[in-house]
Regions:
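Acidic-glycine-rich active-site phosphate/pyrophosphate-binding loop
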Residues: 1-5, 147-154, 221
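Alpha-helical scaffold segments that flank or form the walls of functional sites
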Residues: 19-36
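Short, solvent-exposed amphipathic alpha-helical segments in soluble enzyme
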Residues: 20-24, 107-108, 130-133, 177-185, ...
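Glycine-/charge-enriched secondary-structure boundary and capping motifs
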Residues: 51-75, 82-87, 159-160, 165, ...
Length: 221
């Protein structure tokens, strides 16, 4: 038996290069399927684009998204575009999962270990990029991380008993961990000294290069 997964996600540009942005947005949308233990099968583009912006930029965004969908082994079956003052891109993704191995973002148990598949700090590095204060090493690292599919991690976790799982995105580790703990009627203890972070994140944070959403996440967590 198979269960159907349907999800969507889109956002404004987080990279200067439109091709990179397309890949990042697609990887982000596909991640929701992997977080549930599923396999993406088809995807539809979700696009908002300004009428006075070079259409070649849109072409590069779509090319990046298409390449990432292909990398995931899924089929890009079309999409929809609207006119907007700010470009936005993402995907609606359809996938399948074995209902006996469907991972939810609740059900964590006492004694469970928290495992991260990627280093933290993308929001801080992107803030440094916008301020033109980023190092080249940090720029390359954050782009590689955001473009990387969680497919391999998903396949590894299928070999183990997983009680709860989520993907860490806009609400950060604190927000998503809190959400999972509350839904599981548990608390979570995090040793911040052991958290993996992207290059130069601590330096950027000490400079005050922290996205506004991080403060809201802290209040929630």
């Amino acid at each position: 038996d198979l269960a159907l997964i349907q999800t969507l996600d889109f956002f404004t540009p987080v990279a200067d290069d439109p091709y990179d942005f397309g890949q990042i947005a697609a990887a982000n949308a596909l991640s929701d399927v992997y977080a549930m233990g599923g396999t993406p099968k088809t995807a539809l583009n979700i696009v908002a684009f300004p009428k006075d912006m070079d259409v070649e930029i849109l072409g590069e965004i779509l090319r990046g998204g298409a390449d990432k969908v292909m990398e995931a082994g899924a089929v890009l079956a079309g999409g929809h575009t609207i006119q907007d003052d700010t470009p936005k891109y993402g995907l609606s993704v359809t996938g399948f999962v074995d209902p006996r191995k469907f991972w939810k973002n609740f059900g964590a148990q006492t004694g469970d270990k928290l495992i991260l598949t990627k280093a933290l700090g993308a929001g801080i590095v992107n803030t440094a990029i916008k301020a033109d204060l980023v190092t080249e090493g940090a720029r390359k690292a954050v782009l590689a991380s955001m473009k990387k599919l969680n497919r391999d991690a998903c396949e590894v976790f299928k070999e183990f008993e997983v009680h709860a799982r989520t993907d860490v995105t806009g609400f950060g580790l604190g927000g998503h961990a809190t959400e999972m703990a509350v839904a599981s009627d548990r608390t979570v203890v995090i040793d911040t000294e052991k958290l993996p972070v992207l290059p130069d994140v601590e330096e950027f944070a000490s400079m005050g290069l922290i996205p506004g959403g991080a403060y809201r996440n802290r209040e929630f967590a």
